[in-house]
């Protein structure tokens, strides 16, 4: 599903991520989610649904194109703040405390 929903009938990443995470549980395989991650809330949702990490590209390209290294730092600070706020509102004090029952798909 990289680059958008190319096929109309393809499910969104968030719809299939919990199933993938369950199928890979205990295998040692890390789940990296790419595509559509723009905010700290998006990062939180992906982690809650079973991702081990997220990959973000386009927003960083936009940030560096618009304001160089300073733009990237502003974007990183924004992501970190949004993630921290979302975690706090959901009662998660660490990344390890983010759980599936904190989000709805």
Region spans (language model):
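Alpha/beta catalytic cores of nucleotide-metabolism and tRNA/nucleoside-modifying enzymes
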Residues: 15-33, 38-105
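Glycine-rich, proline-tolerant flexible connector loops at the mouths of alpha/beta enzymes
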Residues: 1-11, 61-64
């Amino acid at each position: 599903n990289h680059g958008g929903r190319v096929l109309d009938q393809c499910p969104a990443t968030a719809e299939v991520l919990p199933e993938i995470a369950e199928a890979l549980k205990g295998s040692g395989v890390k789940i990296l989610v790419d595509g559509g991650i723009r905010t700290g809330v998006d990062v939180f949702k992906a982690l809650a649904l079973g991702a081990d990490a997220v990959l973000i590209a386009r927003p960083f390209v936009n940030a560096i194109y618009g304001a160089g290294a300073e733009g990237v730092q502003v974007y990183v600070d924004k992501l970190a703040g949004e993630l921290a706020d979302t975690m706090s509102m959901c009662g998660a004090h660490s990344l390890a405390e983010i759980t599936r029952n904190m989000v709805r798909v």
